[in-house]
């Protein structure tokens, strides 16, 4: 598997299942093998991505996992389009913290033309101030006209996750289909936006279904694969549904994704702090990307803590110049001490008077 991975070739479905079903005793050997592939294509670099939540909550979609879904009782912050100055401040905090890519996200089915123009203005402003920083946009479903407009404004990438396998999708969401999502990925590709599309592991899918979606993403030629692990928000249908997720379970999935997408950006995304916990440094041996700071509606690790983890592992933040300006309180993050069903809700950054976490 390793030799094929070094040539940029994917593993087979059978090999992928073997990794997922391997014993915990084999984990370190699997990580070491996947790590050779990761370092071959990405050396010791780690790409830091930074999320900016432009519009939070009140989404008309009914995705079962989502704290922003229709009918969600999760006690998250809800706000319409954020003040441009607050967006600017959050972006500056993320870049100062070492972010290589800024991800601008808004809840909802998809943007109106007015919404697209609003976000395009933010993209142009960011690119004018920081031409070397990549911009990823995530606004839901878009057609060719809107995708082309976002690309013309200067966006580099667009995130639209598959989330789970086609065969499992109806159990997770009823307001749109898996096909709708993958059709959107093709729209992005046609219009020159780098497609970022990944999964949420731990939503009741079988091993076979997890393999199906990962291989389908390869078939669609996505450039970046964020791997999230279910955050079981209270007030959502999947609350309490993450008891089976262990650090070893997560690491096997990350390793399998690396072997399936050897030369793609693989990101340990939401849920890594809560589910991989003290074994997060091992994840860096497999993935080449993480999020810096907070997520859309939940808190992430303190920026300084993640940067220290990267340095301690012998890795280098990609694109960071000199000493990043980050918070110094590396003990402020407490997710590792929380039970798996207690999701730390975000109460800082956009929507509050508290500075962003970066």
Swiss-Prot record:
Q: Name one GO biological process term.
A: biotin biosynthetic process
Record: residues binding [4Fe-4S] cluster:
59, 63, 66
InterPro entries named in the record: Aldolase_TIM, BATS_dom, Biotin_synth/BioAB, Biotin_synthase, Elp3/MiaA/NifB-like_rSAM, rSAM
Q: Which residues participate in [2Fe-2S] cluster binding?
A: 103, 136, 196, 267
Named in its record, the pathway it takes part in is: Cofactor biosynthesis; biotin biosynthesis; biotin from 7,8-diaminononanoate: step 2/2
Residue span, Radical SAM core domain: 44-272
Under Enzyme Commission nomenclature, its number is 2.8.1.6
GO terms assigned for molecular function: 2 iron, 2 sulfur cluster binding; 4 iron, 4 sulfur cluster binding; biotin synthase activity; iron ion binding
The protein's required cofactor(s) are namely: [4Fe-4S] cluster; [2Fe-2S] cluster
- Cofactor descriptive note: Binds 1 [4Fe-4S] cluster. The cluster is coordinated with 3 cysteines and an exchangeable S-adenosyl-L-methionine. Binds 1 [2Fe-2S] cluster. The cluster is coordinated with 3 cysteines and 1 arginine.
The record's section on SMART domains has: BATS, Elp3
Q: Which reaction does it catalyse?
A: (4R,5S)-dethiobiotin + (sulfur carrier)-SH + 2 reduced [2Fe-2S]-[ferredoxin] + 2 S-adenosyl-L-methionine = (sulfur carrier)-H + biotin + 2 5'-deoxyadenosine + 2 L-methionine + 2 oxidized [2Fe-2S]-[ferredoxin]
Enzymatic class: transferase
Q: Which UniProt keywords apply?
A: 2Fe-2S, 4Fe-4S, Biotin biosynthesis, Iron, Iron-sulfur, Metal-binding, S-adenosyl-L-methionine, Transferase
Q: Which domain of life is it from?
A: Bacteria
What task does this protein carry out?
Catalyzes the conversion of dethiobiotin (DTB) to biotin by the insertion of a sulfur atom into dethiobiotin via a radical-based mechanism.
Q: Which PANTHER family match?
A: BIOTIN SYNTHASE, BIOTIN SYNTHASE, MITOCHONDRIAL
Subunit structure, interactors included:
Homodimer.
Q: Which family does it belong to?
A: Belongs to the radical SAM superfamily. Biotin synthase family.
Q: Which NCBIfam families match?
A: bioB (TIGR00433)
What name does this protein carry?
Biotin synthase
